[in-house]
Regions:
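Secondary-structure transition motif
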Residues: 1-101
Length: 101
């Protein structure tokens, strides 16, 4: 997926894929969430997030209700660190950011 946000290009095909988090629901469930953390060549981080109609990724439908969607969310380095701490293993954190001091 490619998307321009604030005059910056975010591209999942050219960025480095760090790791992926999925919640416990099946991918056809309206509560399903899948988020992948990427790092661009310039060091910026972003999430490619997708989810069902009962998640933070939902989008309104034209005729009412909601549907699932996929979006790109730019992250500061501090937000990326917090996301990794919350969703991934300590090993991924160390490989990505180094040891916690």
């Amino acid at each position: 997926m490619k998307k321009y946000i604030n005059d910056r290009l975010y591209d999942t095909d050219t960025a480095f894929e760090i790791d992926t988090y999925e919640n416990r629901y099946y991918d056809f469930d309206c509560r399903y969430i899948k988020e992948t953390l990427y790092q661009k060549q310039n060091g910026e981080f972003f999430l490619f997030g997708q989810g069902g109609s009962w998640t933070k990724y939902r989008q309104p439908r034209k005729r009412g209700g909601f549907c699932g969607s996929a979006v790109i969310v730019p992250l500061s380095i501090d937000n990326a660190k917090e996301w990794v701490k919350e969703h991934l293993s300590p090993e991924v954190y160390i490989l990505t950011f180094g040891f916690i001091v």
